[in-house]
Amino acid sequence: MLAAARALRGPRPRWPTPAREHWTPAGRSRSRREAAEAEADVPVFQYVGERAARADRVFVWGFSFSGALGVPSFVVPSSGPGPRAGLRPRRRIQPVPYRLELDHKISSAACGYGFTLLSSKTKDVTKVWGMGLNKDSQLGFHRSRKDKTRGYEYVLEPSPVPLPLDRPQETKVLQVSCGRAHSLVLTDREGVFSMGNNSHGQCGRKVVEDEVYSESHKVHRMQDFDGQVVQVVCGQDHSLFLTDKGEVYSCGWGADGQTGLGHYNITSTPSKLGGDLAGVTVVQVATYGDCCLALSADGGVFGWGNSEYLQLASVTDSTQVNVPRCLPFSGVGKVKQVACGGTGCAVLNAEGHVFVWGYGILGKGPKLLETAIPEMIPPTLFGLTEFNPEVQVSQIRCGLSHFAALTNKGELFVWGKNIRGCLGIGRLEDQYFPWRVTMPGEPVDVACGVDHMVTLAKSFI
């Protein structure tokens, strides 16, 4: 029976056997020469040229229905050419990074309350793009395609923001910043431009009673500073300006003392701050809600504005501080960067350690909800191990109620309130410890908003 089966099956085919040229007896390793020859025989595949430049990428995530992510298909059902066109559902929340397709190299990004600004240092006429909520013309005037006399209150994709530049082919945009309903654009040779709601003077111009901000063409230019502005920052309804002389100017809403000008009134003209900042060279300012921080050249930290959440409790019991105060933090080392959100603050020292204080989810677990004294987040939570001893945090950012940190190894960590998926970690629960955001690129800068984020990145190859 077995013989008959073998006869029907025919002779067993002979498969090629693996070559044995590199076989060595057990217990004897190959010589260095043999190993080098074997390595030289291995084929080399070169997929990318040696001089190939890594491509620039922009990733967005969070709440999309405001249009702030710049992806129209998330807001309006797609209507492609296929037979099932229009059946793709809208996407209210994008919980993980999504690549935004752009034709320009973006150098600065800012997230406002439901809107986004992007800018490029290009010499082309168009240098700034906006997307999202535009009910106060914080993105400029965007003409309706149906009615040329009307403007859009929602901009669903990155659209050019017109600026009244005198030399558009020479002037570069260095930075953008967004508040609750106003925006600032910093240029290298034509001052600062402001757009949007000015009901508190936050755009640096006279407040006009009953001014209509919707569908407005108004873009205001500010140039009356003693020195050149090198950084602009929008708070909720106020603005901060840092000059190359290390001086800080402010304007806007001052009810919590956030203008730092010694009173609680509104200010429509950018004015220089004094207090403990008098004679101090400032290198960075930070704000997003109603509290402000400044960093001096020698690593000193100064604060003013709202202190309802213990932001300034290290120097005062008052909940509003209207002049800059030096915050005498000990044990944090030399500070090289500051960040300020709605209820929490953070500093980064020269050793790459992050310290947090204030109220809310601060990054040290659910047991730490408030503190007036900065506490260090364990460096191991940012990837520091005995196998990776060189890992350091290189940048910190604050949204309204969440934090972000970039490391020198090109990794992005986030923590805080996960409002509408703004953390980009693939789930909607709040995050009490730093958590790494995964994306197909190496993040180099990040902007935090209320319920969305934008990251500038480089492709891996």
UniProtKB/Swiss-Prot annotation:
Function noted in UniProt: Guanine nucleotide exchange factor (GEF) for mitochondrial dynamin-related GTPase OPA1. Activates OPA1, by exchanging bound GDP for free GTP, and drives OPA1 and MFN1-dependent mitochondrial fusion. Plays an essential role in mitochondrial ribosome biogenesis. As a component of a functional protein-RNA module, consisting of RCC1L, NGRN, RPUSD3, RPUSD4, TRUB2, FASTKD2 and 16S mitochondrial ribosomal RNA (16S mt-rRNA), controls 16S mt-rRNA abundance and is required for intra-mitochondrial translation of core subunits of the oxidative phosphorylation system.
The residue ranges flagged as biased composition, category Low complexity, are 1-10
Q: In which tissues is it expressed?
A: At E8.5, broadly expressed in yolk sac placenta, decidua, and embryo, with highest levels found in the trophoblast giant cells (TGCs) and ectoplacental cone (at protein level).
KW Repeat (keyword) present = yes
Query: Which region of this protein is its transit peptide?
Result: 1-34
Name-wise, this protein is: RCC1-like G exchanging factor-like protein
Domain of life, per UniProt, equals: Eukaryota
Q: What is its main location?
A: mitochondrion
Ranges where the record places region Disordered: 1-35
Output the GO biological process annotations, alphabetical, semicolon-separated.
mitochondrial fusion; mitochondrial large ribosomal subunit assembly
Q: Which InterPro entries match?
A: Mitochondrial_GEF_domain, RCC1/BLIP-II, Reg_chr_condens
Localization terms from the record: Mitochondrion inner membrane
Might you report a single GO cellular component term?
mitochondrial matrix
Describe the subunit structure: Forms a regulatory protein-RNA complex, consisting of RCC1L, NGRN, RPUSD3, RPUSD4, TRUB2, FASTKD2 and 16S mt-rRNA. Interacts with 16S mt-rRNA; this interaction is direct. Interacts with OPA1; this interaction is direct.
- Give the GO molecular function terms: guanyl-nucleotide exchange factor activity; rRNA binding
- List the cysteine pairs that form cystine: none
- SUPFAM superfamilies in the record, alphabetically? RCC1/BLIP-II (SSF50985)
- Provide this UniProt record's keywords sorted from A to Z: Membrane, Mitochondrion, Mitochondrion inner membrane, Repeat, Transit peptide
Renumbered ranges of RCC1 repeats = 55-121, 125-188, 190-244, 245-297, 298-350, 352-408, 409-458
Give the domain note: The RCC1-like repeats assemble into a circular seven-bladed beta propeller structure. Each blade is composed of four antiparallel beta-strands with loops between each strand.
